[in-house]
Amino acid sequence: MNKYKPVPKLSSQSPVHHTNLRIPPSGRPFKKEDFLNLISKDSLESDSESLPQEAKSWSDIKDQIQDKDMEPDSLEEDSPSETEEAVNRKAAHNTNREDLSAHDAGVNHSQHQVEDKYSDLRYDPNWKNKREEGQPLAGEALPGSADSSSENLPLAPLYPSREPSMGLSAGKGKEKKSPQSEASLLGSEFLSPKYERSTRQNGFFSELSDSDQEEKSSGLSQYLKSSSSHNDVFLPGSRGPRRRKSKQYFVEKNKLTLGLPMPKTDSYLQLHNKKRGETRLEQISYPVRDTDKMTVQNDKEVENTFMDPEDKWHQRAKQLKNYQEHLSQYEDTKSGNVPRGQSSDAANGQQPSRRTAKARVRKQRKHQKGLKSLGTKELVVSQNNQNNPFQQPQNQRQTADASAKHELAAQTNASNPNLQDARTLTHNPKVTSDSFVSPKQALDRALYKNSISGLNANKRRGHRREEERILYQPQPIYVFSDTHLQDFNELPHRHESPSQRAPQSDHHMNTHRSTKTKKPAKQPQAETKYKNIEMLWKFHSSSDMEPASASPDSRLAQIMEQHQQALMQLAEVQPSEGSLASIILPPILSRVESESQLNSERSHRHQVKMARSNSEGYLLQLERGKRHRKRSSTKSSKLKGYQKRDVKLGGLGPDFASVRDKMQMLMQQKEYAQQVKDYNMKALSILSKPQTSKTESKSAISRKKALDYAKTIPKPKPPNLPDQTAKKTKNSRHSEKEGGLPEISLLEILQSRHEREKQAVAAFKVLHIV
């Protein structure tokens, strides 16, 4: 099993594509000095292959380096800013291929070797033993690299500026490079204890011409700019000897890889991302004009590398706090230049502070919220204002003009970010008057512009909000006059310096026109505010009949005067009855007359708006008339009476009071129904009795008459029969009567039996049997 030494991990997307790196065979270990020789040799050669071949070979080399790397925490994602820098540097590096294409063709053929692309994807059963044996090797190799890097760190700053690269390219053209100069170019991340021996073996630096050295030194400086931001993470010596991690760390790391939820908040990846963001922010915000300041800041950064992470974090927090204070002071001075009825000495730069402490605290909180979205331009302005207090008013005027230009550029070209960046670079005096701009650094300027394009967009958005807040603040209605409007329109020309008037006259005309178009935008709101008022409609109709050639300032002044007159007349016409004090409406008849007049004058669009508002007013008038009628009829129909009605609201649960009231109402209804039923029954009985008496009287009268009539009728006489027949009938009747009676003997038998049974029953009763 092979034992490898730890190799410093490079950024995954480097600006220089190493297509000619020789990959060592798997038989011998992968040493750091071989890798340095390959890097130095390849960085001074140009690419002769096409871009797809470069990308393929670089991906193979990156896979091989990741396979040899022994650091466990190499799972990181590349930021989109690194990919943009890689693309830009690739385009810059392609310009140097034409000079060295012939030399590179011969070397390429001999350096390509067949390798296994998928070696890192195959399963290795001895992965645990490899890791355990690789960790002591990493611990042994740390002290030497830390010492060498600490010795050579003061020679190469962490953030190399453009001036040292220019000086190296111009001054050391014909001389052989010393190890110190090479260390300053390569940076502290490529230093090792055997670096001098590798530089002696590599004699390719001395064979190059002056132009080749010039171009390659600038290319190396560009490369080191991107890689220097990762020094704190990838350098073992920058943070002292690395501690040996326990097995529990790797268990948690594997859990994180498998996607299990981890409660750990301060993981290595999060800390590294925070540190990388801080170094990226510092790298963007560090270009200052004076070279002395640059060297001092670089020395401070070198000192910061030996500090503890906590002390470093506290120092960064202090710097951020100072930056917030400078930014708040700069915003206060910038907002003081805005014309709000101020005097002439305030317009000339002497700004009396009339704000209260509460307003200042509110503004500071607002700036602290939007602090991360601001770019480096405001930082440079605030630093210059602090260092040069005599030039502060002029800088404030320049930043005010620049904010207006940023707003105009963002409104006209929101779909083209490259054009926006070009306009900000051409219009902004801070960028165009840079002291260290040179033709050699045009590509660096483009890269710097791309890196802060997002910040510039956020800053333009902040400037636009500031301008809108200033322009759309509620103006005092009765104090606004024509002179103030004229001063407000002429103030950008007043703040403009004489050196800037000539190239920026066209731009100020555009901003002046945009502010003019923004001012009448308050008119529709004023119209909707007084829609239901008759007098104001008359004034608006007269203002609409004005010719279109009138300027917006005069129209605004006339509208203000008309509003004042309308309010004066409304104070006289306001009704005194006033059931509701907030409703101010004229009589309905005059409203209809004004509607008929306005229909003949206004356009169809205004007719629709007016009809809608008139319908709303008509409904209000109907309600008002109903209330007046109620007031005339009853005393209780007042506003207080209406407010006191139906005030009680039901709760969420059952309302026992309402249930009890309903039950009482039902009982009362039943009682009333029963009373009604009884009353109806009584009424029916009383009415039926006279009817029966009448019928009985009628029947009795008829019966009486019939009986009286029957008494008067004589009885018929029986016929005279012979005597024999009469005797026969008498004898037959007597015989029938005698045959029907029972015999006497039978009757006696039954009677005696009855007596015996009576005695037996009496005996049973005596014996208590029955």
Swiss-Prot record:
Gene name of this polypeptide: Jhy
Bias (Basic and acidic residues): 57-71, 112-134, 295-314, 493-509
Source taxon at top rank: Eukaryota
Name of the protein in question: Jhy protein
Basic residues bias locations: 355-370, 510-521, 625-642
Biological-process GO terms, alphabetical: axoneme assembly; brain development; cell differentiation; cerebrospinal fluid circulation; establishment of localization in cell; motile cilium assembly; regulation of establishment of planar polarity
InterPro entries xrefs: JHY
Organism annotation: Mus musculus
Residue stretches of biased makeup (Low complexity): 218-229, 383-398
One GO cellular component term: extracellular region
